[in-house]
């Protein structure tokens, strides 16, 4: 098992689920001055968290900072995380997973919404016109950590050492203790979902609705959400991610949904789960939850350890002549096999 003590101090990736969150995604404006401002602020977010958190010592305020592929290059860091690349859009069997812009992620969590709001305000004030906000979604914990479809979400998150093993990079030199995070915003058609019987809903999810018990193997559909999100390696070991999804909604905007945020030591694990959902395993045997939940965004970020994040603040100033790089070519499609073994009998959601 991996121990956190082997790493530089991680960011607060594995902090417990809170009552409130803000998912803030921004893009950085062209030019070295904007990149310099963004890099400076990213390195100083910890100071802002302490300043706001001191006002409520029991508020549980944290902020995880993620850096996108193009932004990492613009920051002129001396090295690059091994698996960092833009989120690859998925052309699914019946539904698609889009790739959308995002240079920086600020995943803010607290037990009070005012703490989240105040930290977000200070971050955006510091960034100024160096960035544009492309996603600003306030999330909330819905009853006993259920999604708006009525099912408990994140039941099978690993615990203990397994949580550390799943969330943090072990190796990769200076990037040990970091994490890769994928974010997606899903909107739900609750009216259509509500027309299904509870039994139909349970077969789509793979768990009972009232008491959150996994369906027995003999009645578990092969395209249930649980089955398609269960991966093992060639030795039969579980390949897990850590989810901190939250509900969101605005009836004025006419949308309700789930903000998916999944942390992993290797983004290929999350990407394999998403391909299973959208393409199906085998192809065409896709996740029927997508008939009621539409992905409207998709980003991938690297979450450096706290030490690496602080290191960015100590780098030499960006040279004025440094051009804004052209858009990256789409990276090669990750190996769809991931060396993943057969789906096991015990599934997870």
Per-region residue spans from a language model:
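Long, histidine/aromatic-enriched segments associated with O2/redox biology
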Residues: 1-347
